[in-house]
């Protein structure tokens, strides 16, 4: 098999991953719109997930493309796999093989692992490395690098399959996962 099958779906955490709220005003995270456009061009279904109630989630998601569906957790909370499976059902996904979850939220990443998905941790938006805090802004570049390194280690200790600093690196990460799938690796 020369090429790994196309990705079945990519699930994203909403808060911190796709949307940042600076001073209470939501805006797309750096690289979010380009990443979503690239996946859409390749016809990879995408959906966002969040554990906020639906009105709060929709308020944040209004800065994202209208074509992007979302799923707010109903019932069983993360890290149970239910939300990931429900999001995949909302996309009419027929299989788990080739599904990827991207987030900096450890509970959502654990949910993805429990659901049998490939998982990509976002170090810069994980709680271990909170970019929106005043403390983060006060750090020197070296201290920020150390914090990102610690966040990377914390995310890998959860069991995630890959860790990237930001969404701009997702395309290369997906290529790496495709290579791993080509070799027969499973999540």
Predicted regions and their residues:
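Asp-based, Mg2+/Mn2+-dependent phosphohydrolase catalytic module
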Residues: 1-44, 49, 54, 61-100, ...
């Amino acid at each position: 098999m020369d090429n790994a099958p196309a990705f079945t779906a990519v699930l994203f955490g909403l808060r911190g991953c796709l949307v940042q709220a600076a001073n209470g005003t939501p805006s797309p995270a750096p690289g979010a719109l380009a990443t979503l456009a690239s996946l859409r061009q390749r016809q990879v279904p995408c959906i966002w997930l969040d554990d906020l109630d639906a009105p709060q989630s929709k308020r944040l998601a209004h800065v994202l493309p209208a074509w992007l569906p979302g799923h707010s957790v109903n019932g069983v909370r993360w890290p149970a796999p239910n939300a990931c499976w429900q999001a995949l059902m909302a996309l009419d996904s027929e299989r788990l093989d080739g599904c990827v979850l991207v987030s900096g939220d450890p509970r959502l990443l654990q949910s993805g692992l429990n659901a049998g998905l490939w998982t990509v941790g976002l170090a810069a938006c994980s709680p271990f490395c909170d970019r929106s805090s005043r403390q983060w802004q006060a750090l020197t570049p070296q201290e920020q690098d150390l914090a990102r390194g610690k966040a990377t280690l914390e995310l890998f200790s959860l069991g995630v399959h890959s860790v990237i600093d930001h969404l701009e690196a997702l395309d290369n990460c997906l290529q790496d996962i495709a290579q791993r799938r080509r070799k027969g690796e499973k999540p």
